[in-house]
């Protein structure tokens, strides 16, 4: 009789464990990339003339463009100046979550679209490299609410918080920083526009 009772208890416990495991597996895990998807990421000085803008999707893939307008670089063939341009795609992956507001993100792949120099409507378009992002780089992602005191002066410049009338104590937007490239992308909802 004891053997039957033990078997029943074992079967009951096994069934409960399997149900709990199934329930845990059924819960969708939200990746940090799910949160970043649907934002416009912009790296710019705020003064205009140049920017790198990209979109990051939920699977970690991304695409973007870089442009730098040099209206003083002109000639008879292109009297309205020169624009350096680049379109690119790539893939990122999560290295690790550092704390509740910080993640390390690696740029696993970066490809630029092959284009040729051309003159169109008085402007010379020159192929360039993506500015601010590079393959193999490990970038640091900061969530809104991160104290601005953790940032270097260069990082603060790229967050654009110092341009606000009253410098906030915490980030209001997402911020993706690269020490290697000395760059910082601010994440904005796509509906409100990219540049500050």
Which positions does each model-derived feature cover?
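Tryptophan-anchored aromatic micro-motifs
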Residues: 28-53, 172-196
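Generic recognition of cysteine residues
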Residues: 21-24, 44, 74, 86
């Amino acid at each position: 009789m004891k053997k039957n009772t033990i078997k029943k208890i074992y079967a009951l416990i096994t069934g409960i464990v399997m149900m709990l495991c199934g329930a845990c597996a059924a819960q969708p895990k939200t990746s940090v990339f799910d949160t970043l998807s649907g934002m416009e990421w912009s790296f710019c000085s705020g003064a205009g003339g140049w920017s790198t803008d990209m979109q990051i999707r939920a699977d970690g893939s991304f695409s973007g463009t870089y442009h730098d307008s040099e209206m003083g670089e002109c000639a008879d063939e292109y009297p309205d100046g020169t624009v350096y341009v680049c379109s690119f795609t790539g893939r990122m992956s999560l290295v690790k979550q550092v704390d509740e507001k910080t993640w390390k993100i690696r740029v696993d792949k970066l490809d630029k679209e092959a284009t040729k120099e051309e003159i169109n409507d008085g402007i010379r378009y020159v192929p360039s490299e993506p500015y601010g992002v590079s393959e193999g780089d490990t970038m640091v992602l900061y969530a809104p609410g991160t104290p601005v005191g953790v940032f270097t002066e260069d990082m603060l410049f790229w967050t654009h918080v110092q341009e606000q009338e009253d410098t906030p104590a915490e980030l209001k937007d997402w911020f993706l920083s690269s020490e290697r490239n000395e760059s910082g992308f601010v994440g904005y909802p796509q509906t409100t526009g990219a540049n500050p």
